[in-house]
Amino acid sequence: MDFVAGAIGGVCGVAVGYPLDTVKVKIQTEAKYTSIWHCVRDTYRQERLWGFYRGLSLPVCTVSLVSSVSFGTYHHCLAHICRFRYGSTDVKPTKADITLSGCASGLVRVFLTSPTEVAKVRLQTQAQSQTQQRRPSASWTSVAPALCPAPTACLEPRPKYSGPLHCLVTVAREEGLRGLYKGSSALLLREGHSFATYFLSYAVLSEWLTPAGQSQPDVLGVLVAGGCAGVLAWAVATPMDVIKSRLQADGQGQQRYRGLLHCVVTSVREEGPRVLFKGLALNCCRAFPVNMVVFVAYEAVLRLTQGLLT
């Protein structure tokens, strides 16, 4: 049931957090945005409400599978570790056991999420690249009337990607399989230690928030533990998340980065060390409500099925 509960929790979470995820990606990949509000205002002015939901269909279709694998892998890995170390799955796992299982859960996710992350980032940043292409130079404007009676129509390029599936097919055709796994090195580093932090912090906070005489926290305890676990996980994940987003968005036009280290060095040299924490506040603001919903849905499904089976 961990797989089913994880799937339901993941879908609920993505429904809550996707608009803020779009803003986060734009802030991380476009240097022109000076603040969260600047990005929100600019996105709404150019694309209206739909601009915050670009590329949503693919995450909604795949997040149930990914979340299911994450929670299922964590649970089964933890059970195998306890059985191997202590001879029984009923023994309370140590923090090291939880950390290792969480890390394994994060690493497994990468093989499923990398292609969808590439498509999501390309679609989320596509509108900005189109806007830059439409912006004419002074010299072009001076001759435009003679060449084209309707400059606006001539300057409106069609989007390169018409949707998530078209984006995946286009990337695979133009860049090969490596294109679908672009940024996966940064994604591995992000997911490994962030999911170790995620599950460890949730387990510790749940234990602290469990009322005396009970074996598990109430709904309020789950809300607080889940939200805080999400915030802590994104706090450690943000530097690699910035690099991941830049590497994955780099497939559009001339490529700037040769790899993970080159991206880190170039980004820090051009924008300073603070660039690695671009979107941190937004990540944390998004993580709290999203992971509150994820863990409440996850725990609700588990407790419901346990009640029906007993």
Swiss-Prot record:
Q: Where are the Solcar repeats?
A: 1-80, 93-208, 217-304
For membrane topology, the record states: Multi-pass membrane protein
Reactions catalysed according to its record: NAD(+)(in) = NAD(+)(out); acetyl-CoA(in) = acetyl-CoA(out)
Where would you say this protein principally sits, based on its record? mitochondrion
Where it sits in the cell: the answer is: Mitochondrion inner membrane; Mitochondrion outer membrane
> Which residue windows are coiled coil?
none
Q: Name one GO molecular function term.
A: acetyl-CoA transmembrane transporter activity
Specify whether Lyase is a keyword of the entry. no
- PROSITE patterns attached to this UniProt entry: SOLCAR
Q: Which InterPro entries match?
A: Mit_carrier, Mitochondrial_Carrier, Mitochondrial_sb/sol_carrier, Mt_carrier_dom_sf
Pfam families for the chain: Mito_carr
Per the record, the similarity remark reads:
Belongs to the mitochondrial carrier (TC 2.A.29) family.
What does this protein's UniProt record list under function?
A: Mitochondrial NAD(+) transporter that acts as a 'metabolic gate' in hepatic lipogenesis. Provides NAD(+) substrate to mitochondrial SIRT3 deacetylase and enables its NAD(+)-dependent activities in mitochondrial energy metabolism. This triggers downstream activation of PRKAA1/AMPK-alpha signaling cascade that negatively regulates sterol regulatory element-binding protein (SREBP) transcriptional activities and ATP-consuming lipogenesis to restore cellular energy balance. May transport other mitochondrial metabolites having an aromatic nucleotide and phosphate groups, such as acetyl-CoA.
Supply the name of the protein: Solute carrier family 25 member 47
Q: Which organism is it from?
A: Rattus norvegicus
Query: Which gene name belongs to this protein?
Result: Slc25a47
